């Protein structure tokens, strides 16, 4: 196991999401679901494949379903009334992810979002997900500081690839990968454009991608 991929359910209710995730005909599943009150339910054993990522890639991993644990957070998503993730839900997520990290010997940077691994198709867990907060617990990374830099698309794509993004995925390209990066590290302004702030953040995240950085916040972050 190499990754933990975070999702939102994107359905009207927890019951509807659970029904879909346990329906063999739906051809979609996840290892865990965490309700808004923090109740966590295991659906698929960690040593078995769950069908949660779809066409996706991260670093050298092209078969994300076969190399990751998928966690679904109950949230209506952008189609049904996207809303902040409650503290109880995030506390349960942190506890679960720390246990998964310990069981599988995963580094902090192994915790990513669905939109990170599938930037052309997905936007979950979305701009309201508290990436900075969970990085403070050793789940994901957050740059301690950053400096605006002159935009350089070649250098930006090199940095994004070093972080793990895959511009080569079907129907993907620079703008979609940049938007996915912004959704994770600059959620207050997601436009897919390589501006000086985004350029500086790419360099900062790349430099901090092996250890969690617990202080400071990127623009618009929670």
Feature names for model-found ranges:
Residues 2-109:
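Active-site-adjacent loop/helix surface patches within enzyme catalytic domains
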Residues 54-57, 87-105, 109, 119-222:
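Cell-envelope/ECM-targeting effectors and their regulatory/trafficking segments
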């Amino acid at each position: 196991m190499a990754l933990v991929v975070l999702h939102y359910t994107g359905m009207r209710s927890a019951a509807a999401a659970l029904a879909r995730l346990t329906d063999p005909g739906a051809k979609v599943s996840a290892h865990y679901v965490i309700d808004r009150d923090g109740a966590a339910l295991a659906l698929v054993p960690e040593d078995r494949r769950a069908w949660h990522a779809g066409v996706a890639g991260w670093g050298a991993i092209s078969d994300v379903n076969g190399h990751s644990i998928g966690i679904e957070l109950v949230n209506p998503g952008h189609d049904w009334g996207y809303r902040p993730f409650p503290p109880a839900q995030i506390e349960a997520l942190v506890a679960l992810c720390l246990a998964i990290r310990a069981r599988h010997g995963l580094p902090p940077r192994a915790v990513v979002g669905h939109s990170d691994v599938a930037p052309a198709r997905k936007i979950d867990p979305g701009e309201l997900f508290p990436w900075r907060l969970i990085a403070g617990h050793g789940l994901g990374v957050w740059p301690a500081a950053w400096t605006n830099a002159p935009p350089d698309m070649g250098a930006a794509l090199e940095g994004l690839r070093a972080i793990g993004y895959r511009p080569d995925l079907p129907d993907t390209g620079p703008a979609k990968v940049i938007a996915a990066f912004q959704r994770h590290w600059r959620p207050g302004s997601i436009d897919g454009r390589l501006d000086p702030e985004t350029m500086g953040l790419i360099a900062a995240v790349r430099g901090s991608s092996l250890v969690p950085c617990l202080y400071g916040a990127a623009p618009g972050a929670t």
